[in-house]
Amino acid sequence: MAHTFSCFADASLVRTTGGSVRGYRFDGLDIFKGIPYAKARRFHAPEPAVWDSVLDATSYGYVCPLLEMPKPNGEMLVPHRYWLMDEACQNLNIWTPALDDAHRPVLVWLHGGGYFAGSSIEQIAYEGENMARLGDCVVVSINHRLNILGYFDLSDFGAEYANSGNAGGDDIIAALRWVRDNIAAFGGDPGNVTVFGQSGGGAKVTTLLQTPAADGLFHKGIVMSGVLGRLADCTGSGRDCAEALMAELGAADIAALETVPYAALAAAYNKVAPALKAAGKNTGCAPHPNAFYLGDPLENAFRPETARIPLLVGTVFGEFAAFNGFGLNKAQMSAADLPFLDVLFREPTMRYIRRRAETGPVWSYFFNQDFTIEGGRAPWHCSDIPFVFHNTELVPSANISGVTPQLEQQIFDAVLAFARTGNPQHSGIPTWPASTPQQENTMLFDSATRLAPNHDKALIAAALPAISALMARNFDPDSIQH
């Protein structure tokens, strides 16, 4: 296949609120990578980024440093990419069909990895080219602060650290403000922004709905495997963790922690955090409920200000089937094993959908397609991402003879229909009504896509008590790295 590329001084040049940026033209798209949307001191709120000369936006920006070096995990199933890490990671990428005034729908991708890992380019399936070209939309992906850089509560140490436990969420909001103020120059509609994400990225969508500062910055949300029943408890003070870090590093105060080299900070954290976590202390790495973030809606109710925002919410059948010790092919799993593999996500997702349906439109989906790789596998956590981005061609494990082309188009068209109209219905799938508090109208996406009201409700309810007890003993969500 022949490709076209151009990058000239006067081409793909856009003036933004921070300064001018130059991207490049590739196969009919204007592409911009690594645009700074903010800057921030460690543990502090982000501020707008500005520059004087034309910024070269032709390569990806830094990604957030991790607490541990990434380990290859399931590369055949979820191909990864790794990149330069630095705390100056507040940057975004844009794919757009044209720099015009077409006011295309805008889709802003929030990456997975919990709140402690991942990046905007971690998975090859995150590439926005096909979505932008085939969907005639503008795709944005962002990097932001993670782990103790983004979610370390230091509010006990002074007003300047009042929201350090949500610095990563504050970065995301800064990126959405940048999109609001600049995306029209990239051919997008600032009045039609959909935030979508998978796993930790999906959880970030639910967090934004509970964050008043995000109001008006997005208009629809897609939550893919993002409602998890058991996360780290970050409701308490982070004082104990901070004091343990200061003692380990010989730092006199929090200001000294701001200047410690990140590698030393991460090493100290990895040394002191396990015992603190075991003792039930707040060790960071997840949003901290306060006036900025109002907490999990399943515990604290949905905010009325965002209750009418349309949502598309779902999971995949296997979820952690391929990770965290569940590396079994389908022939090795008994019927009793299978509910365990999806109930961690599916059960709280079902509750979320029903509760959300009390106040606003929400559509339910379930990715149910088995794969042929390694003798046959149930769909795993992340296996739906290539279908959403129309990127199955980039992920060999996603290619199923006689199935993938149609299934990919069904899912992709549902996502684009939702981004355009707030309803995922399109001509290539059965009638798909929104869910109600009494009935979860779930679209099962597989080789025979169909609507399945209240899918697996009775099965999961019956299995939940035993499974919950097992998970409480054996499951640590921080151990998952995809």
Q: What role is predicted for each listed range?
A:
Residues 35, 324-325, 350, 354, ...:
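Mobile gating loops/cap/lid regions near enzyme active sites that modulate substrate access
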Residues 202-214:
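Short glycine-enriched nucleophile-adjacent loop
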Residues 197-200, 212, 225:
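Catalytic nucleophile serine of serine hydrolases
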Residues 1-166, 190, 375, 398-411, ...:
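Non-catalytic accessory segments of hydrolases
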Residues 112-113, 167-171, 199-202:
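Active-site loop->helix "elbow" adjoining a glycine-rich segment at hydrolase catalytic centers
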Residues 162-184, 240:
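Alpha/beta-hydrolase active-site loop
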Residues 105, 186-198:
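Alpha/beta-hydrolase fold nucleophile elbow
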Residues 181, 215, 220, 224-354:
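Substrate-access "cap/lid" subdomains that shape
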